[in-house]
Structure formats: C-alpha cells, structure tokens
C-alpha cells in the first residue's frame, strides 16, 4: 500500500513535523491524575484534562460539550448504583464537515489504572519520560498517548487547510477501566457516527471483537466456633468452616472453565473461549475462630455469541448459577444453606465485520506507513463494544505498547505514536472525504 496523493504526503509530513507537540500533549495528559476510581473516591484531574482537550478542539473550530451525567440512583446492570459523575465530565466535540462525506467517531478514555507498586517504576509515573525511543508514564499507551494522537491528527489536517466532507465526532469518556459507564453515558447522550475508532494500543491491528464480563460474588455460609476445640457434627450444632466449604465452589469454577474450553459454542475465530477466574476471597474474622462465612468474587468472560436477546449476559449468569449449585449439591450442608449470588458489572461484548470499510481503510493507511496490521480480537473488553452495540460500528486501533498496559513502566514508542497519528489523519481523509 502507498500514499495515494500529494495531499496525503503533505498530511503525513505535517504529523511528523508535529512530533514534539505530540509528545508534549501526551506529557500534559499523563501529568494529570485520572486514576480509575474505586467506590467513594473523590474526583481527581478529570475535569482539567477534558477542558484541556476541549480547548485544543475549539481552536480547530469544533463545537464542544462537557457534561456530568446523572444516572438513576438505583443503577442497573451497566451503571453501578450511586455512581456520581460530579467532577468527572464526559466530552463530545463535533468538527462539522462540508457535507456529503461519511462521519467518524474518534473515541478515547481518560482514566488510567493506578500506579502501584509506585516504587518499582524507573521514573515518576506522572512525569512522561523518554528512554531509548519510548515514552514511559501511566497512560502512555492506555490510552493518553492514543488520545493525544487523535488530537494531533486533527490539528495536522487543520494546518494543511484540509476540510473534510464528513463530520468528525470526538468523544473522551471516564470510567472505562472500571465499569464502562462513561461510554454508556455518551451513548445515552446521543454520541455516534457512521463508524468509529477507539485509540487503544493495538499495535496497528484492528480489534473488531472483544469478550464481555459479568462479575459474581458468591457467598458460602458456615457456622462459627472455636477453631481449637473439637466440633460435633453440624447437624448437632457443630461449627462449619465456610472457607473449607468454598473449596467445592472453586473446584466447580475450574471444571466449568475446562468444559467451556472444549465446547463448540465457545469457539470464536478471533477470541479465546469464555473463562471464569476467581480473583478475590474474603473469609474469617479471627485466627482461632472457625469462619461463619466466606465469599469469592470471580471475573467471568463471555463471548459475543452468548449475549442474550435483551443485550445482556444473563444467560451466562444462569449457567454459572446452575453449574456451581450442582457442584455442591452432594453436600447436605448446602441443601439447607444454599450459595448466595450477587452480580455486578455486566460489560457486554460486541463485534463488527472484519471487512467493514472503515477497518480496511484504517489498516490500509497504516500499511502505507509500513505498519501492517490485521483484524483481531481483544480477550478483555473495551468501550468500542458499547458504541458498536448502540449502532456505531467501532473498533480499537492504535499504537504499540499493549504488552505494558496496566504494568510498571508502561510505555509507547515515539515512532509508533507518530505513525498512529499519521494513520488516523490519512484515515480521516480517505473515510470522510475532502471538501471540493
């Protein structure tokens, strides 16, 4: 693949000339603490970051809007109850085209995972540091570098007096790293386009599909007693160790995982089978007290073909309840004290055609710059799924660095970031068209 015109050559050169600005904007974004929230956390620098982006886009002539969503207090499967967006605005901006072209959504999330263990970083994670051709810092690849690349692509087109025929919708959201609620709120607000790109660090591949997640906390009842005293049978009032009883539940998860690996309905051309992974265990109150309860939280990943008719993961939940209940059915204790399931965080998977015109356009633009990617899947989840399910076919496409996402010394190569920004600029020209 090659550049197709003198205009495209000028656009690529304009992005490359803006390398220092791209690194500088990435540094500004990394310096703002937008660590993904835990329940009850106060706002951090989310509003400052969104205002910074809005100002850059307004300078290009974009109509911008920042808003703090107000979800219902009770929440639902997709937005946690009581989630407060005060101080955590979403940003939408529209660069209107001249008319007659296809519109595009450029999406990114501004939250980043925490920096612990901070003392293991080579440098301050909130100070972007260049080392051996790489930029180190929290969010360097996931995904403040990608967001900066989107902005620089738009600025490069503006400097070359390129007006697109189709509209560009730019949207940055919060809460991708936690509940996915920011993307949900953007969709509810009406954000959308003919198709879209989310700037995740894909190493120039196109993540056109992903797995989704449901999260159960399963509580096992026991009966407290003195751990150092012999106990009667539980039917006679003896203590029951909830931690020991939990073992059968964990074994049931392992058996279900192996079954899913072997089942034909868990085969997907781009994704691993569904999975169930215990991630948190809480039980016991004192070292010499037999625990009266124990709970395990699990991360359950499911495939696009397992989304039910209502667009949820309830069918997966029902299967897990049935199978884990069966796993403990031979124990009379569980007949009288059944497992208790509490569910949260249904982030729903999605997929779009690997040969969608925007996918082939973006991959072709990257190939013209020497970056050859292909359609692929993400075994985790991303905001692109939310926009896809809402009617804007969206895939993730971005620079290198995913192998260090969420890790100490997260990094992205300078060359990769520049080429990503140039690929986006080319994609805008080819997808949206240029005003005559």
Short names for language-model regions:
Residues 81-86, 206-210, 268-269, 375-377:
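Short Gly/Pro-enriched turn/cap motifs at secondary-structure boundaries
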Residues 132-135, 140-255, 406-422:
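Fold-level recognition of mixed alpha/beta catalytic cores in primary-metabolism enzymes, strongest
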Residues 2-135, 159, 163-164, 401:
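Acidic/His- and Gly-rich active-site-bordering loop/insert found
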Residues 115-130, 211-222, 364:
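Acidic-glycine-rich active-site phosphate/pyrophosphate-binding loop
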Residues 1-10, 14-17, 34, 59, ...:
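Metal-dependent amide/peptide-bond hydrolase catalytic core
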């Amino acid at each position: 693949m090659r550049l197709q015109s003198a205009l495209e050559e000028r656009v690529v050169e304009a992005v490359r000339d803006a390398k220092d600005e791209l690194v500088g904007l990435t540094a500004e974004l990394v310096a703002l603490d937008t660590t993904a929230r835990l329940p009850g956390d106060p706002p951090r620098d989310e509003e400052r970051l969104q205002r910074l982006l809005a100002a850059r886009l307004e300078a290009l002539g974009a109509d911008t809007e920042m808003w703090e969503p107000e979800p219902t207090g009770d929440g639902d499967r997709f937005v946690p109850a009581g989630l407060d967006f005060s101080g955590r605005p979403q940003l939408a901006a529209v660069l209107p085209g001249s008319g007659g072209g296809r519109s595009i959504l450029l999406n990114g999330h501004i939250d980043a995972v925490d920096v612990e263990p901070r003392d293991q970083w080579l440098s301050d994670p909130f100070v972007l540091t260049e080392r051996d051709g790489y930029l180190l810092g929290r969010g360097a690849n996931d995904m403040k570098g990608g967001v900066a690349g989107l902005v620089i692509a738009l600025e490069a087109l503006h400097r070359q007096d390129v007006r697109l025929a189709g509209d560009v919708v730019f949207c940055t959201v919060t809460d991708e790293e936690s509940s996915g609620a920011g993307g949900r709120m953007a969709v509810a607000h009406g954000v959308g386009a003919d198709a879209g790109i989310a700037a995740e660090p894909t190493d120039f591949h196109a993540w056109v599909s992903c797995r989704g997640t449901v999260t159960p906390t399963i509580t096992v009842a026991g009966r407290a007693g003195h751990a150092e005293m012999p106990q009667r049978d539980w039917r006679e009032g003896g203590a029951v160790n909830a931690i020991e009883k939990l073992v059968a539940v964990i074994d049931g998860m392992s058996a279900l995982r192996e079954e899913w690996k072997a089942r034909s309905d868990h085969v997907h051309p781009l994704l691993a089978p569904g999975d169930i992974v215990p991630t948190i265990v809480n039980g016991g109150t004192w070292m010499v007290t037999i625990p009266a309860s124990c709970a395990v939280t699990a991360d359950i990943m499911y495939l696009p073909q397992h989304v039910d008719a209502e667009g949820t993961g309830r069918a997966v939940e029902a299967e897990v309840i049935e199978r884990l209940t069966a796993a403990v059915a031979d124990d009379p204790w569980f007949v009288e004290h059944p497992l208790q399931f509490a569910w949260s965080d249904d982030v729903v998977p999605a997929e779009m055609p690997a040969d969608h015109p925007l996918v082939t356009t973006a991959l072709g633009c990257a190939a013209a710059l020497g970056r050859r990617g292909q359609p692929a899947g993400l075994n985790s989840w991303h905001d692109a799924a939310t926009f896809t399910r809402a009617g804007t076919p969206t895939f993730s496409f971005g620079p290198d660095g995913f192998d260090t996402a969420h890790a100490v010394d997260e990094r992205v190569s300078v060359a990769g970031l520049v080429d990503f920004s140039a690929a986006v600029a080319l994609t805008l020209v080819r997808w949206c068209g240029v005003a005559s």
